[in-house]
A protein has these predicted regions:
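A glycine-rich, coil/turn loop motif that links secondary-structure elements
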Residues: 163-168, 202-206, 253-262
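Short helix- or helix-capping micro-motifs
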Residues: 212-221
Length: 372
């Protein structure tokens, strides 16, 4: 069929070539008809070609347009990435300034005060937030002394009450001692988390790994494990570590007790150091971070009561042998911001003191918008 069509297509051309001379009017008319048909066919062919080119061009344009959109989208992502990077650099710079800040600038006294560690922009609390915090603090004062510090690590702004009241910290100090071991000894290679440690004396537990002891200390608040760690590592640089952080060594190195008496201001300094260490991308730092997020008791976590909020803490509680304490301190992460919270009280531990401490934590947390 294809060859026949091809031959038929060329017949009119031969006819028009040889029969136009000296032919009859009818023959001439036939020739004109043939020429007209040829022209029509040619026009049709040209139209098809033009249509094909147009369709192809349109198809090409449709193909190009998504590519252009993709490029634009990628450019937007790059811009956002650059903005995020700039913001990250700004945050790092702010943290650097914050790390050099004098924590003695945190105001003291038995009134709720706000402060800034990096500039003169002192925040103002909303009346409702201030009233809730004052109410929770008053309830605590009915049972003992109380002091708090709460601040935003990104802005350096915070709120405090009685920042220098010294109370028995009980188990709240255990996480900070674990910080000393990991940051100073493990990261330097002096101590291996999986290395065996002999425990002895009245609290002998046989051979334990450093990892197991720290986990028992942080997650389960085990006293025997804590005493074993202090006996093993107090003389390996602990005093220098404390001094470099600007902490009163007489408070942190009380020879009469493995559990220091200290204040919210000291707690704020040490948990700022904790935040710096946990931001490091090391096996030990990430492991310790996970332990702090898994503590068996947290008055802060109970008070905030929000699964979207990450709380890494260590609480302390006791009501026996003349020692009274209900404390909690840690790091709170929400919406890309990290806060340091320290609550130190001499309330004898009970269900009521636990509820009051949780209420203080909630009231402090609710002031965060003013600290940005």
């Amino acid at each position: 069929m294809r060859n026949n069509a091809s031959r038929d297509e060329y017949v009119p051309q031969h006819g028009s070539r040889y029969e136009t001379k000296g032919t009859s009017s009818r023959g001439l008319a036939d020739a004109r008809v043939r020429v007209t048909k040829i022209a029509a066919i040619g026009m049709l062919t040209l139209a098809v070609i033009i249509l094909g080119i147009t369709v192809k061009t349109y198809a090409s344009e449709r193909t190009v347009r998504p590519d252009a959109s993709t490029v634009q989208l990628q450019n937007e992502k790059v811009s956002k990435s650059k903005a995020s990077a700039d913001q990250a650099l700004s945050t790092v710079d702010l943290k650097t300034r914050l790390s050099k800040a004098d924590f003695n600038d945190i105001p003291s006294g038995d009134t709720v005060r706000t402060f800034s560690l990096v500039d003169n922009k002192t925040p103002a609390l909303e009346d409702e937030s201030l009233a809730s915090l004052q109410d929770a603090l008053c309830r605590a004062q009915e049972l003992g002394d109380v002091g708090v510090v709460f601040y935003d690590l990104s802005s350096g702004r915070g709120v405090t009450y009685n920042a220098d009241v010294e109370v028995y910290g009980a188990s709240s100090y255990k996480a900070l001692y674990a910080l000393y071991i990991c940051e100073t000894l493990v990261e330097s290679g002096q101590v291996s988390l999986d290395g065996p440690l002999a425990t002895y004396g009245g609290y002998s537990m046989g051979w334990q790994t450093v990892r197991n002891l720290i986990e028992n200390v942080v997650v389960n608040s085990d006293n025997d494990s804590f005493i074993a760690l202090r006996a093993a590592f107090d003389h390996d640089g602990y005093e220098d570590w404390i001094a470099n952080l600007g902490v009163d060594d007489e408070t942190a190195l009380n020879p009469m007790s493995d559990f220091p008496t200290y204040c919210p201001r000291t707690s704020a300094k040490l948990w700022r150091e904790m935040s710096e260490y946990l931001s490091c991308d090391t096996e030990a730092s990430q492991w310790l971070s996970g332990l702090l997020a898994s503590t068996s008791r947290s008055f802060i976590r109970d008070g905030i009561a929000d699964e979207q909020v990450l709380v890494r803490n260590k609480a302390g509680w006791i009501s026996e042998d003349g020692y009274y304490s209900t404390c909690d301190a840690g790091l709170i992460d929400i919406d890309g911001c990290t806060y340091v919270m320290g609550i130190m009280t001499s309330m004898p531990w009970s269900d009521r003191s636990s509820e009051v401490t949780a209420a203080i934590a909630k009231a402090l947390f609710d002031t965060r918008a003013a600290l940005a």
